[in-house]
Amino acid sequence: MKSDSIAVDVPAESSSAIKGKAPLLGLARDHTGSGGYKRGLSIFDFLLRLAAIVAALAAAATMGTSDETLPFFTQFLQFEASYDDLPTFQFFVVAIAIVTGYLVLSLPFSVVTIVRPLAVAPRLLLLVLDTAALALDTAAASAAAAIVYLAHNGNTNTNWLPICQQFGDFCQKTSGAVVSAFASVTFLAILVVISGVSLKRP
């Protein structure tokens, strides 16, 4: 007797079907990996904002409290140096206070980017506003740095004498405020770069 063999034909997937499925799996893997590194950038963004808030707040508070009075001869004849004697320092305090307020208000948006790392709208908003805050912060810090330089060194061409030998505490506070302001400028610049990298498509 001869045994009958039964052949079962299994339809093979066409090459076009295989080509159609493979990219979908690859896309899913890329999507997950993109969300992971973007969440990491968002967490770093949040921490940098906290550091920028501390630096900007310290700069505004230090400059706003810079005041020194020198008595001469009698208590009725005194020389005083204060930040509000110079419009540049007044602009510095106001500008840095605005930057500090913005950074505080931007924290919830930074949290949103952590929860939803692939969301584009909050990251784009932060990029635009961070750039504006960076410009304002840089302008205030640079202008104040020029005045602090004159206070320390003077200018012989215009007969502007240095005052830091007499008003040492005042110059120390204003110099510290400028250093803190430039620290916040650095943090904001990094925040702008992070936002730009996060907006890059995977």
UniProtKB/Swiss-Prot annotation:
Q: Which InterPro entries match?
A: CASP/CASPL (IPR006459), CASP_dom (IPR006702), CASPL (IPR044173)
Q: What is its main location?
A: membrane
Pfam families, per database record? CASP_dom
| Localization per record | Cell membrane
The GO biological-process annotations, alphabetized, read as: cell wall modification; cell-cell junction assembly
Q: How does it sit in the membrane?
A: Multi-pass membrane protein
What GO cellular component term, any one, is given?
A: plasma membrane
Residues in compartment: Cytoplasmic: 1-40, 112-130, 198-202
Q: Which residues lie on this side of the membrane: Extracellular?
A: 62-90, 152-176
Listed transmembrane segments: 41-61, 91-111, 131-151, 177-197
Q: Give the protein's biological function.
A: Regulates membrane-cell wall junctions and localized cell wall deposition. Required for establishment of the Casparian strip membrane domain (CSD) and the subsequent formation of Casparian strips, a cell wall modification of the root endodermis that determines an apoplastic barrier between the intraorganismal apoplasm and the extraorganismal apoplasm and prevents lateral diffusion.
Q: Give the family from UniProt.
A: Belongs to the Casparian strip membrane proteins (CASP) family.
Q: How does it assemble?
A: Homodimer and heterodimers.
Q: What is this protein called?
A: Casparian strip membrane protein 4
